[in-house]
């Protein structure tokens, strides 16, 4: 799958991918930067893609997670919806003069509350076992452009929006990542055309299962 994506990007005339494509299924998706991409995909697995391309030397960094058999299980759906809620909320509130640290604190609270309500954790502090990276980083000429997390975001900065949850005990790793263009009072989702709603993913998988 990694090779197919990389080939497609180059075949479309784009520059080489800006970082090694991640195509992680099952428990491998609970490893943040898994890149071996050499395991067999089991029927009930989710597969997590973290991938990108370059355009005029600027990087894109996108993640999507979907069920390889086309249907989310009940538990997969529960965890996915928690991550999706965080992703949507960060997109909704991100704007100039906020800091990445502020976005991270909001993201952690949403994920912790969701997991607590779903009985996936017993205390909000446990969220650190299942979410252990930043919700955002600066994107530009490099996939991770240098940026201080306490620095107010300027207008026209581009940042990632990538909440995730990783449960090794269930073999479930989910990350949903978009690229946001920061404006004065809002953010523009540059990757909004890439589907991420459960109903859209399942519909797409059903339509293309052959």
Spans of features found by a protein language model:
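Active-site neighborhoods and metal-handling regions in enzymes and metal-associated proteins
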Residues: 1-210
